[in-house]
Amino acid sequence: MKDVYGRELEDLRITLTHACNFTCFFCHMEGENDGDSLLSADQISLVAQIGMEFGIRTVKLTGGEPTLRRDLPEIISKLKEVGIKEVSMTTNGYLLKELAGKLKDAGLDRVNISLHSIDPVIFKEVTGVNVLSKVVEGIEEAKKVGLRPLKLNYVVTRKNAKGIFEFINFASSSNIDEIHLIELHPVGLGKEAFYTHVDMSDIEGRLNEDCTLVEIRNKHKRPRYKCGNLVVEVVKPYANPIFCSGCNRIRLTVDGKLKTCLYRDDKIIDISDIIKSSYSTEEKEELLREAYRLAILIREPNFRFRYETSKTG
């Protein structure tokens, strides 16, 4: 089902928790405390199941830090049981050494691991914790159990911008499939940290010199480079109408709301009363269908092209 801008809905992003064992200074912090608001594995899978009727095929688990959910394997397995084609997860990697095998067995297909520096000093400055070696161990375990393609996320700030190409060399030599160089964007605490924003133009210029541009991704117009065996993708979502024009995502928040745009707080459908109610499964399913229809109806790009017209005569 398409929205009024012709965009298909394909990907459901699920915030499993606001809790995190890192304190990255630019973190989105899409909420504050979980309280009693966490959705159960059954509630999450029901929302995903109905979403499939409207085009949802893939699910990305996010946080906070999703590996802090003790029922994470159950959540993953239930999502696969209802027919989700691909379940992936964004994680800081701290607990992956212990959990990667269990999550793979539960049905997790792949991971994006947030690693914003391979310099221990800068890593601690960015994340607030001195655990770089443990994250690297988690990366190795993810490779070992087959969570592929394995991608690393690198949010570019003034603190770590000088280390980008050292990071690229590390990823290439470590048999990483892909890295995403992500422009800092002012969402949540990112608003306060936006003074550390780095213009990505110089970085792209260096990539054009040192690597090979292989494609521009069709939906979001992201440039993808080949640096040896490594794919490097540049992600610039903020104030980017091209990015928004290809958006195929909707977010399920930790407290049970369908958020139609990451950058907006005015296009939200609260479904918590539905999924936490004592209604029958059939009643919940029909109400969720109505919620999805409404969410798609009100969904619109946050950033749009502006066309100027002039009148003559």
UniProtKB/Swiss-Prot annotation:
GTP binds at R13, K60, T90, K151, R249, I250, R251. InterPro entries: Aldolase_TIM, Elp3/MiaA/NifB-like_rSAM, MoaA_arc, MoaA_twitch, MoCo_biosynth_MoaA/MoaC, rSAM. S-adenosyl-L-methionine binds at G64, S114. Catalyzes the cyclization of GTP to (8S)-3',8-cyclo-7,8-dihydroguanosine 5'-triphosphate. One of its GO terms (molecular function) is GTP binding. This is Probable GTP 3',8-cyclase. Transmembrane segments: none annotated. It catalyses: GTP + AH2 + S-adenosyl-L-methionine = (8S)-3',8-cyclo-7,8-dihydroguanosine 5'-triphosphate + 5'-deoxyadenosine + L-methionine + A + H(+). [4Fe-4S] cluster 1 binds at C20, C24, C27. SMART domains: Elp3. Its cofactor is [4Fe-4S] cluster. Residues 4-224 form the Radical SAM core domain. GO terms for biological process: Mo-molybdopterin cofactor biosynthetic process. The keyword S-adenosyl-L-methionine applies.
